[in-house]
Protein backbone atom coordinates (compact mmCIF):
# COMPACT_ATOMS: atom_id res chain seq x y z
CA UNK A 1 0.00 0.00 0.00
CA UNK A 2 2.81 2.38 0.91
CA UNK A 3 4.53 1.62 -2.37
CA UNK A 4 1.34 2.40 -4.31
CA UNK A 5 0.94 5.71 -2.47
CA UNK A 6 4.57 6.54 -3.16
CA UNK A 7 4.10 5.91 -6.86
CA UNK A 8 0.93 8.02 -6.89
CA UNK A 9 2.83 10.89 -5.26
CA UNK A 10 5.70 10.53 -7.73
CA UNK A 11 3.32 10.54 -10.70
CA UNK A 12 1.48 13.61 -9.38
CA UNK A 13 4.76 15.45 -8.82
CA UNK A 14 5.88 14.61 -12.35
CA UNK A 15 2.58 15.80 -13.81
CA UNK A 16 2.81 19.10 -11.92
CA UNK A 17 6.45 19.51 -12.98
CA UNK A 18 5.57 18.90 -16.64
CA UNK A 19 2.65 21.34 -16.51
CA UNK A 20 4.61 24.15 -14.89
CA UNK A 21 7.66 23.46 -17.04
CA UNK A 22 5.45 23.75 -20.10
CA UNK A 23 3.98 26.98 -18.75
CA UNK A 24 7.45 28.48 -18.28
CA UNK A 25 8.45 27.51 -21.82
CA UNK A 26 5.21 28.99 -23.15
CA UNK A 27 5.77 32.29 -21.34
CA UNK A 28 9.36 32.45 -22.56
CA UNK A 29 8.22 31.86 -26.14
CA UNK A 30 5.53 34.54 -25.78
CA UNK A 31 8.11 37.11 -24.68
CA UNK A 32 10.52 36.27 -27.52
CA UNK A 33 10.93 39.17 -29.94
CA UNK A 34 10.56 38.13 -33.57
CA UNK A 35 13.03 39.40 -36.15
CA UNK A 36 10.93 39.63 -39.31
CA UNK A 37 11.76 41.17 -42.69
CA UNK A 38 12.54 44.91 -42.90
CA UNK A 39 9.61 46.84 -44.35
CA UNK A 40 9.67 48.41 -47.79
CA UNK A 41 10.24 52.14 -48.14
CA UNK A 42 6.75 53.28 -49.14
CA UNK A 43 6.67 56.61 -50.99
CA UNK A 44 3.62 57.76 -49.05
CA UNK A 45 3.86 55.68 -45.91
CA UNK A 46 0.74 55.47 -43.79
CA UNK A 47 -0.01 55.01 -40.11
CA UNK A 48 -1.92 52.34 -38.19
CA UNK A 49 -3.28 52.24 -34.66
CA UNK A 50 -2.61 49.05 -32.68
CA UNK A 51 -4.92 48.17 -29.79
CA UNK A 52 -3.19 45.47 -27.75
CA UNK A 53 -4.76 42.94 -25.35
CA UNK A 54 -7.85 44.87 -24.22
CA UNK A 55 -9.91 41.75 -23.62
CA UNK A 56 -12.56 40.29 -21.35
CA UNK A 57 -9.86 38.28 -19.56
CA UNK A 58 -7.52 41.24 -19.01
CA UNK A 59 -9.66 44.35 -18.49
CA UNK A 60 -13.22 43.02 -18.77
CA UNK A 61 -15.56 41.09 -16.50
CA UNK A 62 -13.25 38.07 -16.35
CA UNK A 63 -10.15 40.09 -15.46
CA UNK A 64 -8.17 39.00 -12.40
CA UNK A 65 -5.43 41.61 -11.99
CA UNK A 66 -6.60 44.45 -9.78
CA UNK A 67 -4.30 47.01 -11.41
CA UNK A 68 -5.80 46.30 -14.84
CA UNK A 69 -9.35 46.39 -13.51
CA UNK A 70 -8.85 49.76 -11.82
CA UNK A 71 -7.32 51.30 -14.94
CA UNK A 72 -9.72 49.74 -17.44
CA UNK A 73 -12.50 52.36 -17.59
CA UNK A 74 -10.12 55.24 -18.19
CA UNK A 75 -8.01 53.22 -20.63
CA UNK A 76 -10.96 52.13 -22.75
CA UNK A 77 -12.46 55.63 -22.86
CA UNK A 78 -9.15 56.98 -24.17
CA UNK A 79 -8.68 54.16 -26.67
CA UNK A 80 -12.23 54.55 -27.99
CA UNK A 81 -11.57 58.25 -28.65
CA UNK A 82 -8.37 57.33 -30.46
CA UNK A 83 -10.24 54.74 -32.51
CA UNK A 84 -12.76 57.43 -33.52
CA UNK A 85 -9.96 59.82 -34.51
CA UNK A 86 -8.22 57.10 -36.50
CA UNK A 87 -11.44 56.15 -38.31
CA UNK A 88 -12.14 59.77 -39.24
CA UNK A 89 -8.69 59.93 -40.86
CA UNK A 90 -8.91 56.53 -42.60
CA UNK A 91 -6.15 55.16 -40.38
CA UNK A 92 -6.39 51.35 -40.02
CA UNK A 93 -7.19 50.14 -36.51
CA UNK A 94 -5.77 46.71 -35.71
CA UNK A 95 -6.92 44.74 -32.66
CA UNK A 96 -4.34 42.39 -31.18
CA UNK A 97 -5.59 39.65 -28.83
CA UNK A 98 -3.80 37.18 -26.60
CA UNK A 99 -5.14 33.67 -26.82
CA UNK A 100 -3.71 30.36 -25.67
CA UNK A 101 -4.01 27.17 -27.73
CA UNK A 102 -1.46 25.17 -25.70
CA UNK A 103 -3.44 22.30 -24.12
CA UNK A 104 -1.10 21.85 -21.15
CA UNK A 105 -1.08 25.57 -20.34
CA UNK A 106 -4.88 25.61 -20.51
CA UNK A 107 -5.02 22.79 -17.95
CA UNK A 108 -3.45 25.22 -15.48
CA UNK A 109 -5.43 28.28 -16.54
CA UNK A 110 -7.87 28.29 -19.46
CA UNK A 111 -9.18 31.83 -18.96
CA UNK A 112 -7.52 32.98 -22.21
CA UNK A 113 -7.90 29.78 -24.21
CA UNK A 114 -8.68 30.03 -27.92
CA UNK A 115 -12.38 30.68 -28.44
CA UNK A 116 -13.08 31.42 -24.77
CA UNK A 117 -14.95 34.46 -23.47
CA UNK A 118 -11.78 35.69 -21.80
CA UNK A 119 -9.93 35.79 -25.13
CA UNK A 120 -12.61 38.00 -26.71
CA UNK A 121 -12.19 41.77 -26.98
CA UNK A 122 -13.51 43.75 -24.01
CA UNK A 123 -17.17 44.49 -24.78
CA UNK A 124 -16.65 48.18 -23.95
CA UNK A 125 -14.07 48.54 -26.71
CA UNK A 126 -15.17 50.25 -29.91
CA UNK A 127 -14.54 47.96 -32.87
CA UNK A 128 -14.32 49.61 -36.30
CA UNK A 129 -12.46 47.03 -38.37
CA UNK A 130 -12.15 43.30 -38.86
CA UNK A 131 -8.38 43.37 -38.41
CA UNK A 132 -7.99 40.89 -35.54
CA UNK A 133 -4.61 39.39 -34.71
CA UNK A 134 -4.67 36.39 -32.34
CA UNK A 135 -1.17 35.90 -30.95
CA UNK A 136 1.24 35.38 -28.12
CA UNK A 137 3.03 38.55 -29.22
CA UNK A 138 1.69 40.66 -32.09
CA UNK A 139 4.34 40.02 -34.74
CA UNK A 140 4.46 36.30 -33.95
CA UNK A 141 1.39 36.10 -36.18
CA UNK A 142 2.35 36.76 -39.84
CA UNK A 143 -1.13 38.16 -40.48
CA UNK A 144 -0.04 41.43 -38.87
CA UNK A 145 2.88 41.80 -41.30
CA UNK A 146 0.51 41.11 -44.19
CA UNK A 147 -2.04 43.72 -43.10
CA UNK A 148 0.59 46.40 -42.56
CA UNK A 149 2.29 45.74 -45.91
CA UNK A 150 -1.04 45.67 -47.78
CA UNK A 151 -1.91 49.07 -46.30
CA UNK A 152 1.61 50.48 -46.92
CA UNK A 153 2.04 51.25 -43.23
CA UNK A 154 5.40 52.41 -41.92
CA UNK A 155 4.33 54.10 -38.68
CA UNK A 156 2.58 52.46 -35.73
CA UNK A 157 0.73 54.07 -32.85
CA UNK A 158 0.61 51.80 -29.82
CA UNK A 159 -2.10 51.49 -27.15
CA UNK A 160 -3.16 48.80 -24.67
CA UNK A 161 -1.36 46.55 -22.21
CA UNK A 162 0.96 45.52 -20.69
CA UNK A 163 3.79 48.03 -21.13
CA UNK A 164 6.25 45.53 -19.70
CA UNK A 165 5.11 42.52 -21.69
CA UNK A 166 3.08 42.34 -24.92
CA UNK A 167 3.29 46.06 -25.64
CA UNK A 168 7.05 45.95 -25.16
CA UNK A 169 7.60 42.81 -27.27
CA UNK A 170 5.39 44.21 -30.05
CA UNK A 171 7.38 47.45 -30.12
CA UNK A 172 10.70 45.61 -30.14
CA UNK A 173 9.54 43.40 -33.02
CA UNK A 174 8.28 46.45 -34.93
CA UNK A 175 11.63 48.20 -34.46
CA UNK A 176 13.36 45.11 -35.85
CA UNK A 177 11.30 45.55 -39.01
CA UNK A 178 12.02 49.27 -39.38
CA UNK A 179 8.69 50.76 -38.32
CA UNK A 180 8.52 54.21 -36.77
CA UNK A 181 6.87 53.76 -33.38
CA UNK A 182 4.83 56.23 -31.36
CA UNK A 183 3.46 55.15 -28.00
CA UNK A 184 0.36 56.96 -26.77
CA UNK A 185 1.59 57.01 -23.21
CA UNK A 186 -1.66 57.65 -21.34
CA UNK A 187 -3.37 54.90 -23.38
CA UNK A 188 -0.93 52.20 -22.24
CA UNK A 189 -1.09 50.56 -18.81
CA UNK A 190 1.08 48.18 -16.83
CA UNK A 191 0.93 46.16 -13.63
CA UNK A 192 2.88 48.92 -11.90
CA UNK A 193 3.68 52.53 -12.76
CA UNK A 194 7.35 51.92 -12.02
CA UNK A 195 7.53 49.13 -14.63
CA UNK A 196 5.86 51.38 -17.20
CA UNK A 197 8.34 54.20 -16.53
CA UNK A 198 11.30 51.82 -16.72
CA UNK A 199 10.20 50.33 -20.04
CA UNK A 200 9.37 53.72 -21.55
CA UNK A 201 12.79 55.11 -20.67
CA UNK A 202 14.50 52.16 -22.34
CA UNK A 203 12.33 52.49 -25.46
CA UNK A 204 13.02 56.23 -25.71
CA UNK A 205 16.72 55.41 -25.94
CA UNK A 206 15.89 53.21 -28.95
CA UNK A 207 14.17 56.03 -30.82
CA UNK A 208 10.55 55.37 -29.87
CA UNK A 209 8.52 58.57 -29.56
CA UNK A 210 5.79 59.26 -27.03
CA UNK A 211 2.78 61.53 -27.05
CA UNK A 212 -0.44 62.12 -25.15
CA UNK A 213 -3.77 60.99 -26.57
CA UNK A 214 -4.76 64.62 -27.14
CA UNK A 215 -1.84 65.03 -29.54
CA UNK A 216 -2.80 62.06 -31.69
CA UNK A 217 -5.21 63.76 -34.16
CA UNK A 218 -2.63 66.37 -35.19
CA UNK A 219 0.21 63.88 -35.57
CA UNK A 220 -1.41 61.07 -37.53
CA UNK A 221 -1.42 60.76 -41.32
Name each region found by the language model.
Residues 56-57, 99-103, 138-139, 162-165, ...:
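Solvent-exposed loop/turn segments at secondary-structure junctions
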Residues 167-175:
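Short Gly/Thr/Asp-enriched flexible loops that form oxyanion-binding sites at enzyme active sites
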Residues 90-91, 152, 178:
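Glycine-centered short loops/turns at secondary-structure junctions
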Residues 2-127:
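Active-site acidic carboxylates
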Residues 157-161, 179-193:
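A short glycine-rich beta-strand->turn/loop micro-motif centered on a GG-aromatic cluster
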Residues 115-161:
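Internal catalytic-core helix/loop-beta-alpha segment
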Residues 46, 117-132, 193-221:
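Structural recognition of alpha->loop->beta junctions
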